[in-house]
Amino acid sequence: MYTLYAIWSRPSDADIDAFEAHYTKTHAPLASVVPNMRRFMTTRTTDGLAGGDPAFYRVAEMAFDSKEALEHAEESEQWAQVRADAGQMIERYNVTMSVAIGSTDQDNGGAL
């Protein structure tokens, strides 16, 4: 698997409800229909290790069969819509989004 992680910073307290409404009702549904995607998951972080604050607020995981499958998805209209919406969210809610991409190791019950 080849996985893209979109890692969002925390919006201000005043913007959290609006950010969540937009993320769950608009952004995630747009992202969920990107072609060639094998799996789409989102997480809203609430806790950090040992009770600390989490280092980020939201994480989206988009898994593809290969780097080439992701590259093909990046050429789609759906991808363009997700990118445009992410840019609008960054501006509107004064957040950042970092992206990490790479091959996914799978542990099938043994050591990696």
Give short role names for the model-derived ranges:
Residues 1-112:
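Macromolecular interaction modules
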